[in-house]
Amino acid sequence: LDRLFRNLLTDSAGNMHLAEISIDKLWNFDSPSGLQGLIELRAFETMPDVADQSLAALFVRAVVSMLAQEPITGDLVRHGARLHDRYMLPAGLWEDLGEICHDLRAVGLPFEREWLRSIFEIRFPVLGRLSLPRGEVVVRQALEPWPLMAEMNGGGSTSRMVDNSTDRLEIALPDANVLGDGQVVVHGVGLRFREMGGQLVAGVRYKAAAGWPALHPHVPIQSPLRIEVLDAQERLVARARYFYWNPEGPRYEGAPRTLDEAKARRKARWRPDAASGEPPRRPVPASHCEESYYTLDLRRQPGAE
């Protein structure tokens, strides 16, 4: 198994030990500690309390037990670009969790998706809401993979940096009738919503900071992100700004000391604005990108304001 998977189960730099599924301690004769029969799952973040941490462990044990009873023998699904599109969005992952829990129940393991709700809310918090007469528009944090940059020489050593200048949000309509004939516009570009898990969802990827090195150093910072709701006559009915970082200055004074302080910082980065008295505006239609079916990438939108 070690010889079969060692060149496949690595991180993006080829490191076996830092892979999300690490087998360098399973049956590795090249290391004095490599014959322990261990498989490490390294992609789990530490939960804030014992209950959620135990729940994550229970979920993993349930999946392992299911696979022991019913090994998967079919062909693997080639997800392609969907891994960095659909499955970066909370709605896509929540729907996928539902399918896994359905498979668990099918083999006699009664694991309910709602048990994972608290972990889901920790990982994908609601950043803000826009209230409308028919309901609300919900904005959540989404996942954003940060690419590894080329080698950089400095001080006699070579290192590779990560481009952390981009961020991704999910904008969801829990009720398909919330907008009526209106639309949601981000930085002047109209969003295209897709049905997912019983709601309409769109991802938004944007340049959040001026990091270096970066894949797109020429793209200006697109924070604060301006989110607007227009009616059928393209009149502004609701809007808010979301700041990626401290809206009052260049940086925060250290990490938050308490959970309440962290929540207060997040709340302050969502700024609803008055929407009355604005003249009609015409949003720019989003340009098509095959690898971003669910996500609007503002870096690639020439008409973005």
Residue ranges and their predicted role:
Residues 1-305:
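C-terminal accessory/tail domains of diverse enzymes
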